Structures are given as structure tokens and as C-alpha cells.
UniProtKB/Swiss-Prot annotation:
This is Small ribosomal subunit protein uS3c. It comes from Bigelowiella natans. GO terms for biological process: translation. InterPro entries: KH_dom-like_a/b, KH_sf_prok-type, Ribosomal_S3_C_sf, Ribosomal_uS3_bac-typ, Ribosomal_uS3_C. Its main location: plastid. Pfam families: Ribosomal_S3_C. Belongs to the universal ribosomal protein uS3 family. It comes from the Eukaryota. Disulfide bonds: none annotated. GO terms for cellular component: chloroplast; cytosolic small ribosomal subunit. Part of the 30S ribosomal subunit.
Length: 246
């Protein structure tokens, strides 16, 4: 049997960077690593609650997180949240031409999120260790560029269609038609596993357009996997994208 390596971890230091950047003494490493886990978990939970409260009609009405990067400097924690959304309310705006109402709503979301994170991670125990209570959390929400070539957003679009009972072949065709129009995308591969279209026997189906050179370390590969919760059970979704070098 072939052994598969994670496409992103395989390329850290070449085409990708670590999601968390900080240095700490070895005895405190597990503590901060667990704190990073709590930060990411609470961010996803916060935006899930926010999306559900908006009664979204489709995926474009929701706020989809594509990446979370954490940087630490002394007692400050900088969190960059990359999101894909058509709703400009969530983005930090600047300049004289910006709508004051958008600024207020954007700042309100950031302030609420900072309070939630500070409350959840400012004080917890891991064995006999305690985290520093004086940590300051600074959240920045950034619009994710080129969402149609982002593996996370492509997977979210497919999952949204599958959960809305769109036949999987039609959903795949719609996504491939969109990705083929992207000039900076050299290839895309999508795999779905489970009870496709409600058939009793589970199976896997995959499609590919262009090239996906997984063994080439210098290739700019994006990858994401998630599950779709359907009436007939869970469907596993995996997406690989290969972007041209800019």
C-alpha cells in the first residue's frame, strides 16, 4: 500500500510557512501549542455561531475562514484571520471614503472575538502549568485573495452543494467550470468518498483537470479536506489545487 504524506506539511519551508510563529522554552512548548489549538477552535466556533445567526441563504452570505495565522511577540498574540466572503462588513476598512457604519460593525465583530478568545485562553491549566494571564490578543481580519483558486473555499462550495442535496456530479461540474476560468490555476483535483447520491454502497469518486505534481517539492500545492453532513451520512471531501508560480 502506498503511504501518503500531507501536501502542506511536505512543503513547509519551501512554498509554505508555519501557521504559528513563536519561540519558547521547551518546558512551555506544550502549553502554548494547546493554547493555539484553543484559539483556532474558538475562532471557528465564533464564526459558525455568527453565520447561523445571519440565516444565510447561500455560501456567499456566510463568512468562510480560509486560514488562521498566529504570531507571538513577548506577551502579545497577533492573530490574522483570512476569510472569503462577499459581505464587506467584516473587513477592517480605512480611508475617508469608507462607510462609517461598516467600520462600526467591523470593529464590533473584532472586539467581540478578542473578548471571547481572551476569556477562553487567558487562564487554563495543563498539568501543573498555567498560562500567563497578562497576554494581549490582537485580531486582524483579512480578505482572502483569489478565493476561486483557494482549496479551502472550493471545498466549502462543494460541501455546501452536497448538503443542499445537489447531485455530486453536477456540483463537481459547476466547480470545475469555475476553476477552469482561472488563469493562475494550473490544475485541480477533487475527491468525494461516502454514500454518493444516497446509494447504499459507499465508494470514492474523483476528478482532475490539469496537473497536480504532488512529488515536486517546489510546486505550489494547496490542499484541504473536510466532511459534508448529508441525509445519508458523512461524505469526505478532499481538494488539491496547483497554482502557477507568480
Amino acid at each position: 500500500m502506498g503511504q501518503k504524506v500531507h501536501p502542506l506539511g511536505f512543503r513547509v519551508g519551501l512554498n509554505g510557512n508555519y501557521k504559528s510563529k513563536w519561540f519558547v522554552k521547551p518546558k512551555d512548548y506544550s502549553l502554548l501549542l494547546f493554547q493555539d489549538y484553543l484559539i483556532r477552535k474558538n475562532i471557528f466556533n465564533y464564526f459558525n455561531i455568527l453565520n447561523n445567526s445571519k440565516n444565510k441563504k447561500n455560501l456567499l452570505d456566510s463568512i468562510n475562514i480560509t486560514d488562521i495565522k498566529i504570531n507571538r511577540k513577548f506577551d502579545q498574540v497577533y492573530i490574522d484571520i483570512y476569510v472569503a466572503s462577499m459581505n464587506k462588513v467584516i473587513f477592517n476598512t480605512s480611508g475617508s471614503n469608507s462607510d462609517p457604519l461598516i467600520k462600526i460593525q467591523s470593529n464590533k465583530i473584532v472586539d467581540q472575538l478578542q473578548r471571547v478568545l481572551l476569556k477562553q485562553v487567558s487562564s487554563f491549566n495543563l498539568g501543573n502549568k498555567k498560562v500567563n494571564n497578562s497576554s494581549k490578543i490582537i485580531v486582524n481580519i483579512i480578505e482572502s485573495p483569489d478565493i476561486n483558486t483557494n482549496a479551502v473555499f472550493i471545498a466549502k462550495c462543494l460541501i455546501d452543494d452536497l448538503e443542499n442535496r445537489v447531485p455530486f456530479r453536477r456540483a463537481l461540474k459547476t466547480i470545475l467550470d469555475t476553476t477552469q476560468k482561472q488563469k493562475n490555476l494550473a490544475g485541480v483535483k477533487i475527491q468525494i468518498s461516502g454514500r454518493l447520491n444516497g446509494i447504499e454502497m459507499a465508494r470514492s469518486e474523483w476528478v482532475r483537470e490539469g496537473r497536480i505534481p504532488l512529488q515536486t517539492l517546489t510546486a505550489n500545492i494547496g490542499y484541504y479536506n473536510d466532511v459534508a453532513e448529508t441525509k445519508y451520512g458523512l461524505l469526505g471531501v478532499k481538494v488539491w489545487v496547483y497554482k502557477n508560480k507568480s
